Amino acid sequence: MAKAPSWAGVGALAYKAPEALWPAEAVMDGTMEDSEAVQRATALIEQRLAQEEENEKLRGDARQKLPMDLLVLEDEKHHGAQSAALQKVKGQERVRKTSLDLRREIIDVGGIQNLIELRKKRKQKKRDALAASHEPPPEPEEITGPVDEETFLKAAVEGKMKVIEKFLADGGSADTCDQFRRTALHRASLEGHMEILEKLLDNGATVDFQDRLDCTAMHWACRGGHLEVVKLLQSHGADTNVRDKLLSTPLHVAVRTGQVEIVEHFLSLGLEINARDREGDTALHDAVRLNRYKIIKLLLLHGADMMTKNLAGKTPTDLVQLWQADTRHALEHPEPGAEHNGLEGPNDSGRETPQPVPAQ
C-alpha cells in the first residue's frame, strides 16, 4: 500500500507521519476490539463528537446574546449576522474537515462506520439528558409572589406568559428596561413570542421605544427573522423607517441578516428603497457587499438605484466588481425572470461560489 504524504500540525487535529498511522487492514480485522486501531478510532471519534458539542454550545450562546455594542452593529453591517464565537466555530470546522478528509484517504472509513454510529447514539443520549436539565422550569399554574423586573424581562425571552401577566397586573410598566434600555418588547420581538407581544402592546408598551443603540422592536424583529412580528408591530403604528445609531433602517437590518421575506414585505409597502445609512450605503450596497443574491434581485426589480454613491464614492456596481460574477450580471441585467441567471444563493443552486472578477 502506497504511503500517504506526511502531514504535521493540521490545526487542532495534528497527524503523525504515515509510519505512525494504523493501516486499513487493521480496522477490518476480526479482532478489531483488541487492536490498537480501535483505540485510535475511538479516540478520534470522541474528539470529533466533543468538538461538535462545543460548537453547538457556542452557537446556542451566540443566539442568546443580543448585540449591544456599536462595534457589533458595524460588524453586522459589513459581515452580516455573525459573531466572534461563530467565526471561531467556522474556523474549527474547516480544520476538522481538512483533517477528516486526510484520514479518509488513509483508512477505510466504512470499516468503522458501525463504531461511529454507536458512539454517536451514546453521545446523543448524553446531550439529550443535558439539554433537558438546562430547559427553563415550566411555569407554575399560579404565580403568588411579586415578579421583579429582571424576572419579567427574562420571561419575555423565554415566552412565559403567566410571569408577564403577573408583573403587569401588579402595576409593572410594560416599558421596563435593563441597563441597555432593552425592553420586554425588544426581547420578545427577537424571539418571536407573538402572544407576549400582544399582551405588552395592549398594556401600553411603547412600540418605537429605542434602546441604547436606538434600535426599536422593529429592528429586533428583523434580526430575528419574524415577519409576523413585523406585521404586528406595524398594526400598532411602528415606524418602518426608524433609524438606529448607524442610521440604519429596518430594511438595512433585514438585508444584512438575510431575511428575504421581510425584505420582500417592506418593498411591497413602498418604503424608501434608497435610504442611506451613516456611511451613505443603501440596502443595495449592503446586499452586494454580503452577496445576498435573492435580495439583490428583489431590490432591483423594485427600482433600487444602481448608481447611488456612498460616502466613499462607490456605487453598488463598483462594489460588485470586487465580488461575485453572478451578482455583477444581476446589476447589469435586472430583467424579470432573473432567477434563471444565477441569482439564487449557493445553498439554493447547489453550485460552487464563482470566483471574484477583476474590475474592468
UniProtKB/Swiss-Prot annotation:
Record-level GO BP terms: muscle contraction; muscle organ development; negative regulation of myoblast differentiation; negative regulation of transcription by RNA polymerase II; regulation of transcription by RNA polymerase II
Residue segments, region May mediate interaction with PML, p53/TP53 and YBX1: 5-120
Cellular compartments annotated: Cytoplasm, Myofibril, Sarcomere, I band; Cytoplasm, Cytosol; Nucleus; Nucleus, PML body
Name of one Pfam family that matches: Ank_2
GO molecular function term, any single one: RNA polymerase II-specific DNA-binding transcription factor binding
Keywords, ordered alphabetically: ANK repeat, Cytoplasm, Nucleus, Phosphoprotein, Repeat
Segments of skewed composition (Basic and acidic residues): 330-342
Protein name: Ankyrin repeat domain-containing protein 2
Species this chain originates from: Homo sapiens (Human)
